[in-house]
UniProtKB/Swiss-Prot annotation:
SUPFAM superfamilies: Metallo-dependent hydrolases (SSF51556). Its cofactor is Zn(2+). GO terms for biological process: adenine catabolic process; hypoxanthine salvage; nucleotide metabolic process. It comes from the Bacteria. This is Adenine deaminase. It comes from Pseudomonas fluorescens (strain Pf0-1). The record marks H218 as: Important for catalytic activity. Binds 1 zinc ion per subunit. Coiled coil: none annotated. Zn(2+) binds at H14, H16, H194, D275. Substrate binds at D276. Keywords: Hydrolase, Metal-binding, Nucleotide metabolism, Zinc.
Length: 317
């Protein structure tokens, strides 16, 4: 089944480029940039990838991102991810990048963007993988800081297709960012937002009604609110679900408890994604395979999930 799932044409719609930084590349970039790491070797770092919640993961994620300093670093990061896409027949990807993670430590916005954009362009020309880049605001920072990030991004508006919202969810509702999302839409960008991962269903309502999103990232807690479920089904609002991430961060205790197939069978436009694959133990195919292994996902369900991902693209072919 793994090989069949791997060969299935699919799109990935929920992937943080910084979260695809494999330990081997992290160590190589640290050496290139002469950065001392707190881990003695790759295996020690891998052992640190045990998380009880979203915040524990984010602490390590931001620490790891510190090795990314030059446009070449961001190119190498993105290119390594695109090679994984090629291996797994991901024919289209819409990755996130978090400029604030880098600008807050003194890396110029254009250094980050130039490296990523060059790799995505080469990915289309050399690997045949189409893409649309999403600029994501960090929700644990202020709305004013998000506005400043949008200011920095506007001169490069052609390089990305949408804005998103990620990082620590609890205590940072979508409503906190309503004005910056209004402005981004006015500037011509599409919008997506993480909601209903650790946060309550109310955050999903806010993302839909206040941020006017095209897609919900995660959204697994929608199932707790029947009226919300009906709206998501009626309006066919896609959910970019990340099964391995959800179990690794204890949103579900075990994959056998995951609700993605229940939502699929109810008519929700759910998709399968890897989120931060270097940290969560798998890329898209591994996520599909986990659903087969632990939830008995059938080939028919896998085909529908893959088709949903192609249908839910922001960048249409």
């Amino acid at each position: 089944m793994y090989d069949w799932l791997n060969a299935l044409p699919k799109a990935e719609l929920h992937l943080h480029l910084e979260g695809s930084l494999e330990p081997e590349l992290l160590f190589a970039l640290a050496e290139r940039n002469k950065i001392a790491l707190p881990w003695s070797d790759v295996e020690t770092l891998r052992k640190a990838y045990a998380f009880n919640n979203l915040q524990e993961f984010l602490d390590l994620y931001y620490q790891g991102a510190d090795v990314l300093r030059t446009s070449q670093d961001f190119y190498d990061l993105t290119w390594a991810y695109l090679l994984r896409c090629k291996e797994q027949n991901v024919i289209h990807t819409e990755p996130f990048f978090d400029p604030q993670t880098h600008t807050d430590r003194g890396i110029p916005f254009e250094v980050v963007l130039n490296g990523i954009a060059a790799a995505l362009k080469d990915g289309e020309q050399q690997l045949g993988i189409t893409s649309g880049l999403i600029l994501s605001f960090l929700r644990h920072l202020s709305e004013d800081e998000a506005q400043k990030t949008l200011d920095q991004a506007l001169p490069f508006r052609d390089a990305f297709v949408a804005v998103g919202l990620d990082s620590s969810e609890m205590g940072h509702p979508p409503s906190k960012f309503q004005r910056v999302f209004d402005r981004a839409r006015h500037e011509g960008f599409l919008t997506v937002a993480h909601a209903g991962e650790e946060g309550p269903p109310e955050y999903i309502w806010e993302a839909i009604d206040l941020l006017k999103i095209q897609r919900i990232d995660h959204g697994v807690r929608a199932i707790e609110d029947e009226r919300l479920m009906q709206r998501i089904i009626d309006e066919q609002i896609p959910l970019t679900v990340c099964p391995l991430s959800n179990t690794k961060l204890c949103v579900f205790d075990h994959m056998s408890q995951h609700n993605i197939l229940d939502m699929l069978e109810r008519g929700v436009k759910v998709t399968v994604n890897s989120d931060d694959p270097a940290y969560f133990g798998g890329y898209v195919t591994e996520n599909f395979h986990a659903l087969h292994e632990h939830l008995g996902m059938t080939q028919d369900q896998a085909k529908r999930l893959a088709q949903n991902s192609l249908d839910a693209r922001l960048v249409k072919p």
